[in-house]
């Protein structure tokens, strides 16, 4: 009797695993992220710490590994050393014997013009020879600067089922926020009918006047189709060599098979039933996304055993809380406190502390994000602040109560969040000479 082969559909795990193994992920991690102000003075945005122990890029890398996409290139450019060091320390567990790898792709002026990466499309174009060496069937292009959990196997399966040339992950957002992204329109089959990068007046979704459909900067390309389009774009003098500004609008206008994938169909374990995706590109957004993690049931579940967020694990002792006097009690309430922290007769409320933070007696920290290796002296009172790593907060410093006074020394956002860095305190830990 002849055995019939298994039917390969997008519900078949074998079908999806074959797709993920035949996919190369390329993470664009070379951006500065200027809206994060001083947090990116000495590191690229994907290397900015997040969530108590992670870096922003860990979420995209974890999505790749958890989805079964384990051939990964990371494209770097702006002040990449912190990012490179983190990936080398925390992401060396992939096994090359099974064709698993993370390959760092720094800007090397690989074109005949001898230029650095000029745009997102150019960053991929300059690595075409490396992509061809790995010979993937599909290329998954990702940003390294957003916080979300996504099963990339689902967008890959949908891409193949629709016989698409390009599939773009999309999300509904309030129309007033859409001008910071690529804005799309689709037909009933979710084929993309228009695409505008960061329009001044975003078009709302038909029937939903308060919302717009935006690109998440997540693209699935058929590999050979991608190579052809990048070569064509490179030869266009008028192009800025960017996917959102040039390549995608041109593909939509030429009637290529460009489809949209709804993020809610691949978002992993939504706590509130609403897909979680955060662009932490401003100090306000960064502060809020971190503080949200201290709530009882945050929208982003970091305790999900089925979809762990991988990172470099420092060898640190547990957090310690000392002194229990009425006026000097070491305690943290509604907060996240990481390894190596010592709360010595101080009070922490609704705050997130990264590793190795030391807070001395009679100090109070409220609604704040404290990055690693910060020391806070006695009688300090910090409220609604982000403190950069390595800061030495002096005795008696009070921040967060008088914005006009705070602005004389620190950066204060429109929403009243204060950013404190060592340089602002006169502690020059970053220097060239």
Swiss-Prot record:
Annotated catalysed reactions: alpha-D-glucose 1-phosphate + ATP + H(+) = ADP-alpha-D-glucose + diphosphate
Sample GO molecular function, one term: glucose-1-phosphate adenylyltransferase activity
Alphabetical GO biological process terms: glycogen biosynthetic process
Keyword Transferase assigned: yes
Keyword annotations from UniProtKB, A to Z: ATP-binding, Carbohydrate metabolism, Glycogen biosynthesis, Glycogen metabolism, Nucleotide-binding, Nucleotidyltransferase, Transferase
Residue sites binding alpha-D-glucose 1-phosphate per the record: 117, 182, 197-198, 215
EC numbers, comma separated: 2.7.7.27
Pfam family name, one: Hexapep_GlmU
SUPFAM superfamilies referenced in this protein's UniProt entry, alphabetically: Nucleotide-diphospho-sugar transferases (SSF53448), Trimeric LpxA-like enzymes (SSF51161)
Pathway: Glycan biosynthesis; glycogen biosynthesis
Function: Involved in the biosynthesis of ADP-glucose, a building block required for the elongation reactions to produce glycogen. Catalyzes the reaction between ATP and alpha-D-glucose 1-phosphate (G1P) to produce pyrophosphate and ADP-Glc.
Subunit structure: Homotetramer.
Family to which this protein belongs: Belongs to the bacterial/plant glucose-1-phosphate adenylyltransferase family.
Name by which UniProt lists this protein: Glucose-1-phosphate adenylyltransferase
């Amino acid at each position: 009797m002849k055995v019939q082969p298994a039917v390969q559909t997008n519900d078949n795990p074998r079908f999806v695993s074959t797709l993920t193994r035949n996919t190369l992920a390329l993470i664009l991690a070379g951006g500065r992220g200027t809206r994060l102000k001083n947090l990116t003075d000495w590191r690229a945005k994907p290397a900015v710490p997040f969530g108590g122990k992670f870096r922003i890029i860990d979420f995209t890398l974890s999505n790749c590994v958890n989805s079964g996409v384990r051939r990964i290139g990371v494209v770097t450019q702006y002040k990449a050393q912190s990012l490179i060091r983190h990936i080398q320390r925390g992401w060396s567990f992939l096994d090359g014997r099974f064709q698993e790898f993370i390959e760092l792709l720094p800007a090397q002026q690989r074109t005949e013009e001898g230029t650095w990466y000029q745009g997102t499309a150019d960053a991929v174009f300059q690595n075409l020879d490396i992509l061809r060496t790995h010979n993937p069937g599909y290329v998954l292009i990702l940003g390294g600067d957003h916080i979300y959990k996504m099963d990339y196997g689902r967008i890959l399966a949908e891409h193949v089922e629709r016989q698409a040339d390009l599939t773009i992950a999309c999300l509904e957002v309030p129309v007033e926020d859409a001008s910071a992204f690529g804005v799309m329109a689709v037909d009933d089959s979710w084929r993309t009918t228009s695409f505008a990068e960061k329009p001044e007046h975003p078009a709302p979704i038909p029937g939903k006047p308060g919302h717009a459909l935006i690109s998440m900067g997540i693209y699935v390309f058929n590999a050979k189709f991608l190579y052809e389009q990048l070569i064509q774009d490179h030869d266009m003098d008028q192009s800025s060599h960017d996917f959102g500004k040039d390549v995608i609008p041109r593909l939509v206008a030429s009637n290529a098979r460009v489809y949209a994938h709804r993020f809610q169909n691949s978002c992993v374990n939504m706590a509130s039933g609403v897909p979680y995706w955060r662009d932490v590109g401003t100090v306000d957004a960064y502060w809020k996304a971190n503080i949200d993690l201290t709530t009882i049931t945050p929208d982003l579940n970091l305790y999900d055993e089925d979809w762990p967020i991988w990172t470099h694990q420092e060898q640190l002792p547990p957090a310690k809380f000392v002194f229990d006097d009425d006026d000097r009690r070491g305690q943290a309430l509604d907060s996240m406190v990481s390894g190596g922290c010592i709360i010595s007769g101080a009070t922490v409320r609704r705050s997130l502390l990264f590793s190795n933070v030391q807070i001395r007696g009679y100090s109070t920290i409220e609604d704040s994000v404290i990055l690693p290796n910060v020391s806070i002296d006695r009688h300090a009172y910090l409220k609604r602040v982000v403190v950069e790593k390595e800061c030495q907060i002096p005795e008696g410093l009070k921040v967060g109560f008088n914005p006009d006074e705070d602005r004389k020394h620190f950066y204060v956002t429109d929403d009243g969040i204060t950013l404190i860095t060592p340089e602002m305190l006169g502690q020059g830990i970053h220097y060239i000479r």
